[in-house]
């Protein structure tokens, strides 16, 4: 009896509380004149549209700083960002059409623009349709390992705001092949079953002129060849591009795979595996699907070591090289004063990485000059000027991540605008400036 009375009392309180709130809201709006109500609705709609526009400065000056403020542990900020992208609480570039000067002819197709999202942002392929529409022409998910693994202990991700940089020692934390495969298959099935889907699209990004790559890693105690072969077998049917990550500084022994003999053997086995599966249809039913294979390398290599990597890429017949991953170096140009912070173990990315990545790109480009290898620039890119520097050094397209985390979605439109403006001044297209400094 007492329980019933208690329940009734609580129920009445809840009822009256809800009713009271409704009355307050009703009286508040009833007091407004039609013109005022219209103005309020228009202001709210305008605010929403402004927030949902990827060109809006609100993300750089309000949203991103607030996220950093409420998430002292950057890893939680990363998770919050992915959650927002996953559930559609993210802006998009509405009605934007990339100019032809930005188009990239690569891998037998055309990408709408040369700005790509690097691996590490969407590790488990959860948020592709939130991230891609902010303006990217290419997106890489992963790194993904065969078996789920937690990575290194936390904290393992550190912000260096004075340098627009971060240090991470994640250690290939991954939900594993099965989870990522299921996430990608759900996207494809939803697309195929959608009444409004453009069935003429033949790219696994599910966008007409954009590419989706899956970045493959190995487990901490996994086999240095078999783990990658498992990745090729699992994701060949779901990727426009496959990326072999042998350059993370946070997995013991991984960078040893950049040795010419080891790398040649690994990449040759991967190409053999890919070719043996090319007679199978991909997830969209396309026959003879043979995604290009890229290898991602470190910037912390000598010129002879970079030359050896290019030779390994040529011998194994992979399609290209991503230059580069994060650096283990700590340049004396860092503005961060906290010695403990700046000397955290892990890979440094963001603006301070650019000189190392660009130097490596120039060396790789020099030795890849007489080949068909596609070079991809990655490391410290945060402006149109940066993107053009990498292109002139030999990059067919570029990737970024850290600058996107600091500035927000508006960065992509800004970079594309800056590149298009500079190309117009020079009277050239993006394709015409690739490798210009090496000619």
From Swiss-Prot:
Query: What is written in the cofactor note of this entry?
Result: Binds 1 FMN per subunit.
- What is the annotated localization of this protein? Mitochondrion inner membrane
Q: Does the keyword Mitochondrion apply?
A: yes
Record's catalysed reaction(s): (S)-dihydroorotate + a quinone = orotate + a quinol
What Enzyme Commission number does this protein have? 1.3.5.2
Required co-factor(s) are: FMN
Biological or metabolic pathway of the protein: Pyrimidine metabolism; UMP biosynthesis via de novo pathway; orotate from (S)-dihydroorotate (quinone route): step 1/1
Q: Which GO terms describe its biological process?
A: 'de novo' pyrimidine nucleobase biosynthetic process; 'de novo' UMP biosynthetic process
Family annotation (InterPro entries): Aldolase_TIM (IPR013785), DHO_dehydrogenase (IPR050074), Dihydroorotate_DH_2 (IPR005719), Dihydroorotate_DH_cat (IPR005720), Dihydroorotate_DH_CS (IPR001295)
MF GO annotations: dihydroorotate dehydrogenase (quinone) activity
Q: What does UniProt list as catalytic? A: 248
Once renumbered to this chain, the transit peptide range reads: 1-22
Membrane-spanning regions, if any?
37-53
One GO location term (cellular component): mitochondrial inner membrane
Q: List UniProt keywords, sorted A-Z.
A: Flavoprotein, FMN, Membrane, Mitochondrion, Mitochondrion inner membrane, Oxidoreductase, Pyrimidine biosynthesis, Transit peptide, Transmembrane, Transmembrane helix
Q: Where does FMN bind?
A: 119-123, 143, 215, 245, 296, 324, 350, 380, 401-402
Q: Where along this sequence does the record place binding of substrate?
A: 123, 168-172, 245-250, 325-326
Tell me the superkingdom of the source: Eukaryota
Membrane topology note = Single-pass membrane protein
Family named by the database record: Belongs to the dihydroorotate dehydrogenase family. Type 2 subfamily.
The UniProt function text for this chain reads: Catalyzes the conversion of dihydroorotate to orotate with quinone as electron acceptor.
Alphabetized PANTHER family for the sequence? DIHYDROOROTATE DEHYDROGENASE (QUINONE), MITOCHONDRIAL, DIHYDROOROTATE DEHYDROGENASE (QUINONE), MITOCHONDRIAL-RELATED
What is this protein identified as? Answer: Dihydroorotate dehydrogenase (quinone), mitochondrial
Its source organism is Candida glabrata (strain ATCC 2001 / BCRC 20586 / JCM 3761 / NBRC 0622 / NRRL Y-65 / CBS 138) (Yeast)
| Primary gene name | URA9
